[in-house]
Amino acid sequence: MKIVVGGPPQSGKSTFTASLIQAIRERQRNRPYQLPFSWQPLDVTDNSIAALLNPDSDVEQKRAVDWTTERAEERAAIFEARDEDLVIADAPGLITDELRIVLEPADAIIILANYDEQDKMTEWEEVAEANDIEVFAELTSILDEDLAPGWAQRDRREGIIQSIEREDFANAGGMAYDDTTHRMIKQIATDLLQFCNSNQEPAPSLEDS
């Protein structure tokens, strides 16, 4: 299963994706069977996930390169070639021809939009539909808004999460999130693993840990 985390810029996609990767690794750590799993950056200009997951290494967060059709096709080919059972990819934030190209291999998408740009979720839904990509989850991220994180519809994986700054993630990883958001990310990780292990739509996870 190839799943992309996408949505408008400044929505907390990088920290969310890095936290989701950590949660999947944690879920698998003590299991006798390890589901083949990897992650793949799709944005040629941004290497944030690698920088967040490897804070002690000398990883450049930004790359001084331009998006071109050729580079997008190269990224799509690399994404398509990944043969692990579960591949998590982070997408660029702007809907462009290049974005549509790199999304082509995806089976599903998690759409994440900040509170001020919730209306742009519809645009991402349309991109997903045009590429025959299932919407696995839709999340609104908040930073300073006076709203509480939590599920609106658990079975559809729709809800609100609290965003964090990259510096907070660098210091504490996924534990930098509030308890509710941290639990929601772990539940999404569990759903993805269940989906890949059973090859059918997972039942909602009711666990709180």
Task: Describe the function of each predicted region.
Residues G93-Y177:
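Conserved catalytic-core segment of NTP-binding enzymes
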Residues I3-E26:
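Glycine-rich phosphate-binding P-loop
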Residues R63, A81-T96:
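Switch II (G3) loop of P-loop NTPases
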Residues A50-W67:
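Conserved NTP-binding/hydrolysis module of P-loop NTPases
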Residues R157-D208:
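NTP-dependent small-molecule kinase module
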Residues K2-V4, P36, E84-I88:
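Residue-level preference for the first positions of well-ordered beta-strands
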Residues R27-S48:
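Short beta-strand-centered segment that lines the nucleotide-binding/catalytic pocket of NTP-utilizing
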Residues N30-Y33, A77-E84, I101-P105:
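Flexible, charged surface loops at secondary-structure boundaries
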